[in-house]
């Protein structure tokens, strides 16, 4: 069954508080995944100044152990959503690991995860916009049920295969992720103001200004 991941932010020092780890429900591989996505976020939003927020990350209504890194991309997208205050689509599921550069990495159980979300969609009510984001490197592992294959073929369900977490952000938040100009020095680099990273950058810059004023 799908899990719901949420992230909230408060004034802090750029840390990601892994609630599962704090209450001893998270395994070491999951904790490593959280540290890796923290490093990625610092590299895109904290090159020249500390991110002045602490993020609290959790699996909602999960009361058993959590391990593995297959939720890393989902957690990263949840954090970016919280920082930028841009809502995430709730009709798309995502699974996949990521490295410090944001590159998508394969995970296990991809068929079961897709089938689980598809079945939940059937129970809650199917719409043609629903689907699952997976790492492109898992495409060779797909052996899905016929009803799912048929739904995908008819455009009634979607499987998006991605190579980078920014592609997931764009699908989930409905905006371009943004990139820094290649010619810009790190201290002068600005993301497009309409992009996901640009919106997040503006909010962090405003918060840093308040901190300096105080």
Segments the model singles out, each with a brief description of its role:
Residues 1-25, 29-214:
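Peripheral, non-AAA+ core regions of ATP-driven protein-machinery
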């Amino acid at each position: 069954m799908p899990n719901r991941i949420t992230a909230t932010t408060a004034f802090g020092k750029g840390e990601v508080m892994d609630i599962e780890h704090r209450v001893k429900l998270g395994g070491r591989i999951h904790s490593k995944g959280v540290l890796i996505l923290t490093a990625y976020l610092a590299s895109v939003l904290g090159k020249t100044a500390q991110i002045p927020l602490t993020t609290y990350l959790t699996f909602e209504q999960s009361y058993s152990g959590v391990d593995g890194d297959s939720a890393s991309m989902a957690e990263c997208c949840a954090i970016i959503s919280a920082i930028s205050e841009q809502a995430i689509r709730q009709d798309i599921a995502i699974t996949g690991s990521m490295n410090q550069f944001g590159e998508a990495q394969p995970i296990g159980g991809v068929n079961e995860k897709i089938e689980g979300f598809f079945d939940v969609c059937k129970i809650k009510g199917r719409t043609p916009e629903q689907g699952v984001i997976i790492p492109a490197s898992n495409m060779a592992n797909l052996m899905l049920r016929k009803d799912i294959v048929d739904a995908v073929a008819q455009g009634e369900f979607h499987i998006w295969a991605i190579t980078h977490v920014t592609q997931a952000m764009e699908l989930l938040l409905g905006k371009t992720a943004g990139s820094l100009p290649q010619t810009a020095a790190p201290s002068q680099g600005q993301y497009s103001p309409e992009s996901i990273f640009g919106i997040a950058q503006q909010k962090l810059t405003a918060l840093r200004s308040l901190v300096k004023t105080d």
